[in-house]
Amino acid sequence: MANYSTNEFKGGLKIMMDGEPSSIIENEMVKPGKGQAFNRVRIRKLISGKVLEKTFKSGESVEGADVMDTDLAYLYTDGEFWHFMNNETFEQIAADEKALGDAGKWLVENDVCTITLWNGNPIVVTPPNFVELEITETDPGLKGDTAGTGGKPATLSTGAVVRVPLFVQIGEVIKVDTRNGEYVSRVK
């Protein structure tokens, strides 16, 4: 696999760290008044999920991770595995709960997810950035009840719980940002 120099570091770049594929979360170039410049990098290990901070000297190189990101459609779950299918080749891949992480609460059948494969095995499942889900349970919003924060918890069809505005009712479909789990808008 290719080697990456510190000047090629950016968020989302996949590298090998301690024999495990990792993803760069944040990269900060530091040029002190005295001494050599360096990069302060936050890295998430893709298999263990650990986040660590590491410094690299300017010009140092790191081995790139031999991982492959593929877009696959979510099919179903059998309780132990979540099954995905490649829409071109119709090849199916099963991901376990460890690879899925928090993505499970955002998955809707036939949604296209990005799956990171390492040695042919799924290690990370990334749901679409925005999903449209139906509200199955929430408190009724009372007119004029805006003294608080202006929000209320709502349970969605997948079981996820998000804060929504008071005017949103049971049965409505809302758009949710899966990266931070926040309400975006109602779907007309």
Swiss-Prot record:
Keywords associated with the record: Cytoplasm, Elongation factor, Hydroxylation, Protein biosynthesis
Question: Which compartments does it reside in?
Answer: Cytoplasm
The gene designation is efp
Record flagged with keyword Cytoplasm: yes
The name this protein goes by in its record: Elongation factor P
Q: What does this protein do?
A: Involved in peptide bond synthesis. Alleviates ribosome stalling that occurs when 3 or more consecutive Pro residues or the sequence PPG is present in a protein, possibly by augmenting the peptidyl transferase activity of the ribosome. Modification of Lys-34 is required for alleviation.
What does the UniProt record tell us about how this protein is modified after translation? May be beta-lysylated on the epsilon-amino group of Lys-34 by the combined action of EpmA and EpmB, and then hydroxylated on the C5 position of the same residue by EpmC (if this protein is present). Lysylation is critical for the stimulatory effect of EF-P on peptide-bond formation. The lysylation moiety may extend toward the peptidyltransferase center and stabilize the terminal 3-CCA end of the tRNA. Hydroxylation of the C5 position on Lys-34 may allow additional potential stabilizing hydrogen-bond interactions with the P-tRNA.
Record has Phosphoprotein as a keyword: no
